[in-house]
Structures are given as C-alpha cells and as structure tokens.
C-alpha cells in the first residue's frame, strides 16, 4: 500500500519514492539535486494545508518548541545573535551548554536537501547533531542549538511514515521501508523558513 489507499496515483508514487530517498540518503551522498523536488514539496504543503490524511501528514501546531543542532562559524553567531556569545562564561567546563538565550532572526532552510531542514523537540538529538564532526563544517565551527516555535513555520512529523513497509513498493522498487530512520529519533521537517527565538552555545569565552 502507498501513503493512503485512496490516493495511489502517479503523483503519490513519485512522492513515495522521493520521500524514501530523502529519509534514506545521507547528505554525504546527495547528488544531482535535492531528493524531494518542487512538485513533491508542493504536494506535501497542499496536503498539510487541506488537513487531509492527517493520520499520516501530521504538522506541529501552536507554540511547540523545535530545536536544530548545527555547527556554524563564529561570524554566523556574531551577526545573528551576539548576545549568545556575550552570555558565555569567562571560563569553565568547555563541554557545558549555556542556558538558552533569547534571539530573533529568520532561519532559511537551504542546503543539499533544498528548502527543507531537520528539527527535533528533543535536546539530546539536537545536541548530537551540534557536536558531530562534518567535512562541511566551517574551520572555526561552533556547536550551537537554535530554537523556534512551530507557529513560525511548516513542520512535518516524520514518525508516521515509518509504519509503511513492504507492499507494492518493495516488490516493484525495492523499498522495504519508507522511512528507515523513523523509530530512531523524533524528527520534524521544516519546509522553508522559520523565526529563531532562542539559541544555545557550548563552551566559554
């Protein structure tokens, strides 16, 4: 079965295959453009706006807090949230995270996955992404966690997609599980932009 027994169409087949590619492909291996093209993103946004298939396409609503762990340059922080740098202790445990500092700047999803970025409500998951080394990180990379409210953007819960296994897509396309990462962590996808309301850094001045 596809995402919904009533919408197994050519568009839905394309969406299923692209979602699997999105969930199952590390950023290191993304080539030839984002896994989800503009048509697929448009379909997802349309479904979220309509409220249809809400058992699968679940959107974070209201003032729910979302976190994103990243490694960014010193200048990135200085330009957007210098108050976060000023709030760091003069000295101390270099592995200790600061308390969240209020911030107010837009975050634009823009990378190998296109206009989509990964967020989570779980601090430990965000911290792991913020402290994981990557060849794409800036030379002067600083681990940081930015915070936003669900009401400032379009956030899609990825967990419901984990229940889709086997079926015609496994037989015809070798897709055994739509979202191979679905049960490992709580992940939401931000489509487009949001407004950052808080930021945390690790370390001291």
What do these predicted regions represent?
Residues 1-117, 123-205:
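Conserved NAD+-utilizing ADP-ribose enzyme module
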């Amino acid at each position: 079965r596809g995402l919904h027994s009533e919408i197994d169409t050519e568009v839905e087949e394309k969406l299923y295959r692209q979602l699997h590619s999105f969930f199952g492909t590390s950023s290191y291996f993304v080539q030839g453009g984002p896994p989800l093209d503009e048509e697929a993103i448009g379909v997802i946004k349309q479904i979220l706006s309509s409220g249809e298939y809400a058992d699968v396409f679940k959107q974070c609503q209201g003032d729910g807090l979302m976190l994103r762990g990243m490694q960014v340059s010193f200048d990135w922080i200085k330009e957007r949230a210098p108050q976060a740098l000023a709030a760091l202790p003069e000295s101390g445990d270099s592995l200790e995270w600061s308390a969240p500092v209020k911030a107010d700047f837009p975050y634009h999803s823009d990378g190998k996955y296109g206009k989509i970025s990964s967020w989570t409500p779980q601090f430990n998951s965000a911290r792991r992404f913020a402290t994981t080394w990557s060849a794409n990180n800036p030379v002067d990379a600083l681990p940081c966690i930015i915070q936003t409210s669900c009401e400032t953007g379009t956030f899609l819960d990825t967990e419901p997609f984990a229940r889709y296994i086997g079926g015609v897509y496994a037989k015809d396309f070798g897709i055994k599980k739509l979202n191979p990462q679905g049960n490992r962590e709580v992940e939401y996808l931000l489509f487009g932009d949001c407004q950052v309301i808080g930021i945390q850094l690790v370390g001291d001045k």
